[in-house]
Amino acid sequence: MIRSHRRSAPVRGIAVMCEKYLRAWHNDAFYEFDRNGEGFAIQCFARWAGGRTLTVWDVGAHHGEWADAAHAAMPDAHVTSFEILPPVAELLAARHPDAAWLTIRNIGLSDSEGSVDVTWNKDHDSTNAIAPRSTSKWFASSDLQTIACPVSTIDQLIAQGAPPPDLLKVDVEGHDAFVLDGAKQLFTGDHAPHMIQFEYGDTWIPAGRLLHQTGAMLAAAGYKFGRLYPRHVEFRDYSYGDENFRMGNIIAVRDAGLMALLSGQH
């Protein structure tokens, strides 16, 4: 019935309403920090960590919105923010002129050292990307500039003496899997992050990556992972149905107590 009448106005209307429902159900492309679960995840981590001294890495810092929230929840933690584009890094520094708790590094992270071309979308600069969604509405009639930027890896920076992160957040518009690939030694070592947050969604399509690949790597390192919702993380084994490219955040942890907090069990 539905297949045979998919062009009819009532059936099309039902499909539109169902898609709206599913977007909300999946917490898809919802960026209000205090309502999409990101604030909840930080609060859970802060509660679990107690008063211990923490190192936090914010990879893909943009203007520092996530770093500010992490600092508010964990004022004694030191946050290192990585912002690959020099113009955006300058704005980040201008917003935090005297922040002793914050170190800003104008460098990108990837799976190898070198240089990459980054598309700076001046009209929508939260969509800046190494592999941009160039056919999306965000890039239609936009003021774009390509900038060559240096990149390193998490493992390389730690080998050079950077303190390893207790909490690692990655939001780099589709390059997230490459950043995590560059931390394989960290993830399997004695100083692996207690919690990892990374963005997953249709930004991964131009980059040619799958959650299946990254999930397998994290699972091999002993992590459990799941999608972040406003008041819980749904930890579960990966299934092909999870490869839906709906924008959102994935949380990965190894500690059972932290997992229980994030699952909304306490």
Residue ranges and their predicted role:
Residues M1-H266:
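Phosphate/nucleotide-binding beta-alpha loop and adjacent structural elements of enzyme active sites
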